[in-house]
Amino acid sequence: MTGTFTRQRATGLRASWLLAALLAGCAAGPDFRRPLPPADAQGTLPATVQTASAATALGQAQQWNERMDLGAPWWRQLGSPQLDALIDEALAASPTLASAQATLRQAQELQGAQAATLQWPRADLVLGSQRQRTSPSAQGQAGPGREFSLQSASIGVQYPLDLAGGNRRALEALAARTEHRRYQLEAARLGLAASVASVAITQARLVAQGEALQAIVDNLQQQGALARERVRLGQASPDEVLALQALLEQARSGLPQWHKQQQQAAHLLATLAGRAPGTAALPAFTLSEFRLPEVLPRTIPSELVRRRPDVQAAQALLQAASADHGVAVARLYPQIRLSASLGRQALSTGALFGGESAVWGLVAQLTQPLFNPALPAERRAALAALNAAAANYQAVVLDALRGVADAMRAVEGDAQALAALARSDAAAQASLQSMERQHALGSASYVQLLVAQQQVLQARSSLVAAQAQRLTDSALLFQAVGAGWEGAASVATLDGR
């Protein structure tokens, strides 16, 4: 008899292990693997080892480097302590970053709560007390009814057995979405730093261009006064005065626009730093305090997709969609839930802990969907969401590649433009010096001298804009390659790569 029971028990155990093995083989889909990086298109990379140089401020050549450390804050290479302090303030006080940080904490807590639910058994203490009356007539018997009390105390334990892998995939999806929030926060930080740097450079450019514009207005006023004097002496016609007056008013019309742009830049800078516009003094930036970075990153596409936080965020969403598809697949297979309870029941509180009051129960429940049209539809919907996430990831990668290629071309092209404008400025300066010598010798009029001075001022305004653009190009390139955060050098992905 004992041998028969032992054989039956062994057969039951083998059947249980066989069922577990079969369900484990139906685990919800393969593990997520990071998409292959795009091919390294050398045609988008700079063909030279350095940019063009110009004989002017902020005109030095910049070297391209494929092994540049991109984890450090890149904005410190611009050489402005005021900018460093303002970016630090913005990173600490920005309400946009505060919102992103709170959203990340929410995702982390939700992930922890769900992990505790799916990975660990659930235990509950249940205390009960009830009073009820029974009627013998309900059982076809005669006699009066009986009233009694029932006291109970028990501990129940429940655990969902994750043989099909649905719980594991659900946790993977939550972890991926938490990582998505983290990468979004990093992208917001980098975007904020780049915006502050760009607006500060714009403000410095406006200061220099405002000085040049005011000098042009002063020069035209001098020319107009001289023309009126010549008209009074009969040496010029009134048309000359009218022409100069038109040029003067045209130049003056740029001053309100310049003031508007300067105020808008100040307001934007205050907002980025977490301040209300006009509530506190902001640093006054000038081009002379900035330094052009000597080395710039030359990044190949396969490295870029591992570095930019927005690409990593898109990859996290792709992994979450893959895990959601696994959850939908797992629902098609049997679900097993184990539960157990141990406690006491008695008619009175005093007898609750007596030797005969112990009760217990063990339950193993297996649920196999037989007819549920919603489950296949959910699986197809999850597959469509996975395909959409894959397409979105590809779009983000392509946009990142385009952004870096455009930024590199802008660095090269604007360096060449600055060199040309520097030559134009030098030619205007040489022309002015020649006109000054001729005026001193009496072979050139004062009007000709003023015209030469105005040409120099106009060339200087264009030169200032080109100098500021080189700084802006460098900042945008660092942002495009994902520099400035700890994950820029090596990104730890969710699947252990």
Question: What do these predicted ranges mean?
Answer:
Residues 98-99, 161-189, 239, 243, ...:
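Sec/SRP-type N-terminal targeting helices
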Residues 63-68, 72, 76, 91-93, ...:
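Amphipathic alpha-helical coiled-coil scaffold segments and their short linker/junction regions
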Residues 1-26:
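Sec-dependent bacterial lipoprotein signal peptides
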Residues 83-85, 150-152, 198, 243, ...:
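Transmembrane beta-barrel architecture of outer-membrane proteins
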Residues 277, 290-292, 441, 462-497:
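Acidic, low-complexity, intrinsically disordered peripheral segments
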Residues 167, 176, 183-300, 410, ...:
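Periplasmic alpha-helical coiled-coil/stalk elements that build and connect Gram-negative outer-membrane
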Residues 45-89:
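Post-signal-peptide N-terminal segment of Sec-exported extracytoplasmic proteins
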Residues 26-50, 89-162, 260-281, 292-377, ...:
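A small-residue-enriched
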